[in-house]
UniProtKB/Swiss-Prot annotation:
Chain ranges of the Fe2OG dioxygenase domain: 153-253
Enzyme Commission number(s): 1.14.17.4
Pathway info: Alkene biosynthesis; ethylene biosynthesis via S-adenosyl-L-methionine; ethylene from S-adenosyl-L-methionine: step 2/2
Protein family membership: Belongs to the iron/ascorbate-dependent oxidoreductase family.
Disulfide bridges in this chain: none
PROSITE patterns: FE2OG_OXY (PS51471)
Protein name: 1-aminocyclopropane-1-carboxylate oxidase 1
Species for this entry: Petunia hybrida
């Protein structure tokens, strides 16, 4: 079995740039996932985020989760649970408008820490998109512009905690799915594992590493690259021992962004008679995804293709 791709991002600025770009290319084409070290976000920032996130769960969310488990009688289930996940979550919006000031129960210091962390993640996401452009032969800024819409991208963080689960064989931490959006940056617990991706028909563990950022590609990048890069099914396995923290930050297209395969890539694919992906408004895709998240992505693409005659093709905004 191949090793999960772990990439030292600082090497794109040195003599190992070509080899590092090739590693990113291979990860995008063959895994849909990779793990970044030396990515530029200071370790002390990540340590503070982790400490405050775990503290917030203990203080404000742990008891609510226990009450939910009791109300659903989840600890006594005898058959596989297919309609809910063993996770405690809340969501922070950063772009186009932040909701961090409005989210209840957050200490002011935690709000400031998360604002700072979000800015660093936004910068990293945009840096990665440009590296993907370079590997794809697209002009710098193409993917950011493709995501832009009229108000800029949507960017937010899903903050999750996965408490110890008494029946991990029957309840998933998070059921298998692909991510609907663009590029996802995950800061996960380095002590408790659980994240797995599907590759060549096998579930593979994503290794927990201290101070790393796990990157995965969403459905929109599969469409824009016309299938050259793929979004990949992944899931979280609940654990009997240990609580797992996960902060997944989604850098997604703006709600009114029109998503379609990059013409330069379609021309290359056309020569090989490969199928062209659909064109659609991102918000329309999200409405469809809401009811089909835990199903295969291909029927979603087919449904959008059936609707695409109604989509106006506007030129990509320039930022």
């Amino acid at each position: 079995m191949e090793n999960f791709p772990i990439i030292s991002l600082d090497k794109v600025n040195g003599v190992e740039r070509a080899a590092t770009m090739e590693m990113i290319k291979d990860a995008c084409e063959n895994w849909g996932f990779f793990e970044l070290v030396n990515h530029g976000i200071p370790r002390e920032v990540m340590d503070t985020v982790e400490k405050m996130t775990k503290g917030h769960y203990k203080k404000c969310m742990e008891q609510r989760f226990k009450e939910l488990v009791a109300s659903k009688a989840l600890e006594g289930v005898q058959a596989e649970v297919t309609d809910m996940d063993w996770e405690s979550t809340f969501f922070l919006k950063h772009l186009p408008i932040s909701n961090i000031s409005e989210v209840p129960d957050l200490d002011e210091e935690y709000r400031e820490v998360m604002r700072d962390f979000a800015k660093r993640l936004e910068k990293l996401a945009e840096e990665l998109l440009d590296l993907l452009c370079e590997n794809l032969g697209l002009e710098k800024g193409y993917l950011k512009n493709a995501f832009y819409g009229s108000k800029g991208p949507n960017f937010g963080t899903k903050v999750s905690n996965y408490p110890p689960c008494p029946k991990p064989d029957l309840i998933k931490g998070l059921r298998a799915h692909t991510d609907a959006g663009g590029i996802i940056l995950l800061f996960q617990d380095d002590k408790v594992s659980g994240l797995q991706l599907l590759k060549d028909g096998q579930w593979i563990d994503v290794p927990p590493m201290r101070h790393s950022i796990v990157v995965n590609l969403g459905d929109q990048l599969e469409v824009i690259t016309n299938g050259k890069y793929k979004s990949v099914m992944h899931r979280v396995i609940a654990q009997k021992d240990g609580a797992r923290m996960s902060l997944a930050s989604f850098y997604n297209p703006g709600s009114d962004a029109v998503i379609y395969p990059a013409p330069a890539l379609v021309e290359k694919e056309a020569e090989e008679n490969k199928q062209v992906y659909p064109k659609f408004v991102f918000d329309d895709y999200m409405k469809l995804y809401a009811g089909l998240k835990f199903q295969a992505k291909e029927p979603r693409f087919e449904a959008m293709k059936a609707m695409e005659t109604d989509v106006k093709m506007d030129p990509i905004a320039t930022v």
